C-alpha cells in the first residue's frame, strides 16, 4: 500500500520468518502475472528461496553471493532512476532479501547506500523491498530501517531491545511471542497479532508449478539489443 511500500520481517531461528516470506512470495506469484509483477530474490544462505528458482516472475536468478546481490541492487537503483526520468511505475518489482543484517555487514557502505536510496525513493518508481533479519541490531540496521520500513512483521526475538528495533516501537512484547509463525504486524501506529501460514516445499511446487530457469544475472539485467 502507499502507506507501507517496504516491509521488515524480523525473528530468531524458529520464529517462522522464512516461512512467512515464502508465503508472501507464493501469494504474490499466484495473484499476479509476470507481466504485472517482477520479483528479485537475494538469498545468501541459498536455502530460503530455493523453491522459487524457476518462478516465471523472477527477473534474474536468485542472488547468493555478495557480488550478485550488489549487482542486483545496482541495477535496481539504475531502474529507479530510469523510471523517475520517464515517469513510469510498472511493472511493480518486489525484492526479497533473506538476511539484511548479514548483507549489510558483508557489503558495507555500498550495499547500505543502495538499500537506503531504494527504501527512500523506490515507492514512487514501483519498487518495493521486503527484508528479513534474525539480527535486528540497532548498530547494524538501525539507521537503515528506522524511517524507511513502515511495515514491520515481528516474530519471536531474543530481547526487549531487539523487539524495540524490530517493531520500531517500545514495549511491543515481541520477545514473548511463541515462535513458529506467531507474529506481530506493526503499521501506522497499530499492532496486530497473527499466525503466519506454513507451506512445505512440496506444496509450493504443486501450487506454483514449474517455470523456465531465469537468464544468467548479467544477461537478465543487461540484455543486449
Language model regions located:
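P-loop NTPase catalytic phosphate-binding loop
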Residues: 1-167, 172-177, 184-190, 197, ...
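C-terminal regions of RecA-like/P-loop NTPase motor modules
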Residues: 210-225
Amino acid at each position: 500500500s502507499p502507506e507501507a511500500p517496504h516491509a521488515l520481517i524480523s525473528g530468531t531461528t524458529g520464529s517462522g520468518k522464512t516461512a512467512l516470506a515464502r508465503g508472501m512470495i507464493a501469494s504474490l506469484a499466484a495473484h499476479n502475472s509476470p507481466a504485472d509483477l517482477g520479483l528479485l530474490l537475494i538469498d545468501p544462505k541459498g536455502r530460503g528461496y530455493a523453491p522459487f528458482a524457476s518462478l516465471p516472475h523472477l527477473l534474474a536468478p536468485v542472488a547468493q553471493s555478495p557480488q550478485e546481490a550488489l549487482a542486483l541492487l545496482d541495477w535496481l537503483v539504475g531502474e529507479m532512476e530510469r523510471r523517475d526520468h520517464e515517469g513510469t511505475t510498472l511493472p511493480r518489482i518486489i525484492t526479497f532479501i533473506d538476511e539484511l543484517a548479514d548483507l549489510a555487514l558483508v557489503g558495507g557502505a555500498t550495499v547500505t547506500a543502495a538499500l537506503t536510496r531504494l527504501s527512500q525513493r523506490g515507492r514512487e518508481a514501483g519498487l518495493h523491498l521486503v527484508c528479513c533479519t534474525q539480527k535486528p541490531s540497532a548498530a547494524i540496521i538501525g539507521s537503515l530501517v528506522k524511517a524507511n520500513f513502515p511495515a514491520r512483521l515481528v516474530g519471536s526475538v531474543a530481547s526487549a531491545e531487539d523487539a524495540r528495533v524490530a517493531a520500531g516501537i517500545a514495549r511491543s512484547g515481541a520477545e514473548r511471542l511463541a515462535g513458529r509463525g506467531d507474529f506481530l504486524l506493526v503499521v501506522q501506529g497499530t499492532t496486530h497479532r497473527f499466525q503466519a501460514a506454513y507451506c512445505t516445499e512440496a506444496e509450493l511446487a504443486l501450487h506454483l508449478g514449474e517455470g523456465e530457469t531465469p537468464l544468467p544475472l548479467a544477461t537478465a539485467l543487461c540484455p543486449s539489443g
